[in-house]
């Protein structure tokens, strides 16, 4: 008799995705982040659900309801900080996951990669709207500044902004709709993640060497299930340490002041995971130019597969490309630092140089270096 897990209509889907799935025998811990992102999403949906039970999306009571959650709800402080810091862990895993894809040439699976770029946009939109909900000073002014960027779109800009606001400023209508979208988007993200996996399992995983691994596959369970569980334990250890020892480490003190439209904070800045894009936005003195650069800083990922000029897929055996990759990482860290600094000398020029280098590396320097490496190998 055939095993039930191979015949049952529901169980055979799970079986072919997580148990009997043929996986390359040499994938490293950099391949753990997909499953960690799944765990992050589950944590965010669960903690978010419990927060939504006590939160009120009204400008008069939003701030108080968050205070009430932290003070009066059983373990409300824990749920709130798990959710806030869970977002940071989510983005750390996301950036490492994307970095892995860039380093090992996983972007050659076009459908999987494009769904991934779409997922990145969806997660960023969700995080932005979630940051507005506590209705602190940074929530309000962050929402005002970022939504106002859309007014740079020619002809329809100002109408579009008022349509998103639901009025002539960020107010009750804005908060209510942001809460509604913040609630529904994670479920859309979960569905997209399913499609992401579906496309991945059409081709199978890439591996560090970038070579075809059909000749050497091992079953996903028990090898990679155990490996993933180790990753999950480390993720939970990091998250709980952050939540229990320094829950406000990554937050902004300004957000502990209720939103006040009459008082602008001295430095308006988003959460740390948006700072690199924010720095690129600020480095261009023109409003429309800044908005375009902001959008392109993420959209550029969709262009990467078409800029792959190397005869090798992975960077594992390409030392020059490796150097450039780590320069790109250092550049992104520099942009993240600049995004959190005030707009004054020398931060302005550093931000502008780092922004130029970011686009130059991806669009020009890395493709040319790949051609040079092909030449060295007489390919």
UniProtKB/Swiss-Prot annotation:
GO molecular function (one): ubiquinol-cytochrome-c reductase activity
Residues bound to a ubiquinone: 201
Record InterPro entries: Cyt_b/b6_C (IPR005798), Cyt_b/b6_C_sf (IPR036150), Cyt_b/b6_N (IPR005797), Cytb/b6-like_sf (IPR027387), Cytochrome_b (IPR030689), Cytochrome_b_C_euk/bac (IPR048260), Cytochrome_b_N_euk/bac (IPR048259), Di-haem_cyt_TM (IPR016174)
Keywords: Electron transport, Heme, Iron, Membrane, Metal-binding, Mitochondrion, Mitochondrion inner membrane, Respiratory chain, Transmembrane, Transmembrane helix, Transport, Ubiquinone
Coiled-coil annotated residue ranges, if any: none
Mutagenesis or variant effect for residue 295 to V: In strain: Isolate IZEA-2887, Isolate IZEA-3303, Isolate IZEA-3383, Isolate IZEA-IZEA-5326, Isolate IZEA-5339, Isolate IZEA-5381, Isolate IZEA-5561, Isolate IZEA-6137, Isolate JS3032, Isolate JZ665, Isolate JZ835, Isolate San Rhemy and Isolate SI-91.4
Main location, first listed in the record: mitochondrion
Binding site for heme b b562: 83, 182
Co-factor remark: Binds 2 heme b groups non-covalently.
Protein topology in the membrane: Multi-pass membrane protein
Outcome when changing residue 122 to T: In strain: Isolate IZEA-6137
Gene Ontology CC terms: mitochondrial inner membrane; respiratory chain complex III
GO BP terms, alphabetized: mitochondrial electron transport, ubiquinol to cytochrome c
Cofactor(s) listed: heme b
Pfam families xrefs: Cytochrom_B_C, Cytochrome_B
Consequence the record notes for mutating residue 257 to T: In strain: Isolate IZEA-2887, Isolate IZEA-3303, Isolate IZEA-3383, Isolate IZEA-5326, Isolate IZEA-5339, Isolate IZEA-5381, Isolate IZEA-5561, Isolate IZEA-6137, Isolate JS3032, Isolate JZ665, Isolate JZ835, Isolate San Rhemy and Isolate SI-91.4
Complexes and interactors: The cytochrome bc1 complex contains 11 subunits: 3 respiratory subunits (MT-CYB, CYC1 and UQCRFS1), 2 core proteins (UQCRC1 and UQCRC2) and 6 low-molecular weight proteins (UQCRH/QCR6, UQCRB/QCR7, UQCRQ/QCR8, UQCR10/QCR9, UQCR11/QCR10 and a cleavage product of UQCRFS1). This cytochrome bc1 complex then forms a dimer.
Family indicated by similarity: Belongs to the cytochrome b family.
Role played: Component of the ubiquinol-cytochrome c reductase complex (complex III or cytochrome b-c1 complex) that is part of the mitochondrial respiratory chain. The b-c1 complex mediates electron transfer from ubiquinol to cytochrome c. Contributes to the generation of a proton gradient across the mitochondrial membrane that is then used for ATP synthesis.
Further details from the record: Heme 1 (or BL or b562) is low-potential and absorbs at about 562 nm, and heme 2 (or BH or b566) is high-potential and absorbs at about 566 nm.
Protein name from the UniProt record: Cytochrome b
Taxonomic source organism: Sorex araneus (Eurasian common shrew)
């Amino acid at each position: 008799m055939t095993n039930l897990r191979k015949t049952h209509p529901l169980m055979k889907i799970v079986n072919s995705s997580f148990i009997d799935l043929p996986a390359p025998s040499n994938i490293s811990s950099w391949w753990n982040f997909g499953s960690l992102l799944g765990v992050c999403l589950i944590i965010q949906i669960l903690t978010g659900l419990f927060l939504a039970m006590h939160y009120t999306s009204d400008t008069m009571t939003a701030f108080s309801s968050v205070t009430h959650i932290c003070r009066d709800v059983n373990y409300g402080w824990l749920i709130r900080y798990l959710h806030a810091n869970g977002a940071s862990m989510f983005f750390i895993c996301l950036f490492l996951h994307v970095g892995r894809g860039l380093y090992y040439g996983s972007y050659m699976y076009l459908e999987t990669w494009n769904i991934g770029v779409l997922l990145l946009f969806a997660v960023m939109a969700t995080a932005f709207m979630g940051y507005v909900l506590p209705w602190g000073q940074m929530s309000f002014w962050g929402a005002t500044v970022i939504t106002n960027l859309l007014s740079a779109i020619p002809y329809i800009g100002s109408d579009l902004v008022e349509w998103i606001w639901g009025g002539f400023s960020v107010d009750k209508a804005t908060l209510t709709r942001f809460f509604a979208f913040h609630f529904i988007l994670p479920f859309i993200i979960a569905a997209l993640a399913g499609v992401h996996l579906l496309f991945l399992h059409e081709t199978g995983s890439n591996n560090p060497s970038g070579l075809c691994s059909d000749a050497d596959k091992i079953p996903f369970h028990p090898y990679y299930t155990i490996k993933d569980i180790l990753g999950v334990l480390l993720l939970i250890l990091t998250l709980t340490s952050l939540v229990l020892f320094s829950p406000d480490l990554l937050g902004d003190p300004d957000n502990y002041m209720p939103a006040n439209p009459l008082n602008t904070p001295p430095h308006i800045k988003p959460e740390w995971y948006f700072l690199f894009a924010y720095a690129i936005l600020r480095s261009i003195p023109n409003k429309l130019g800044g908005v375009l650069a902001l959008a392109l800083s993420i959209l550029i990922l969709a262009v990467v597969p078409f800029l792959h000029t190397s005869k090798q897929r992975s960077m594992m055996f390409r030392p020059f490309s490796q150097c450039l990759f780590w320069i790109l990482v250092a550049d992104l860290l520099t942009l993240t630092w600049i995004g959190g600094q005030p707009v004054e000398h020398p931060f302005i020029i550093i931000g502008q140089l780092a922004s130029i280098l970011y686009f130059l590396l991806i669009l020009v320097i890395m493709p040319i270096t790949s051609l040079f490496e092909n030449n060295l190998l007489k390919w």
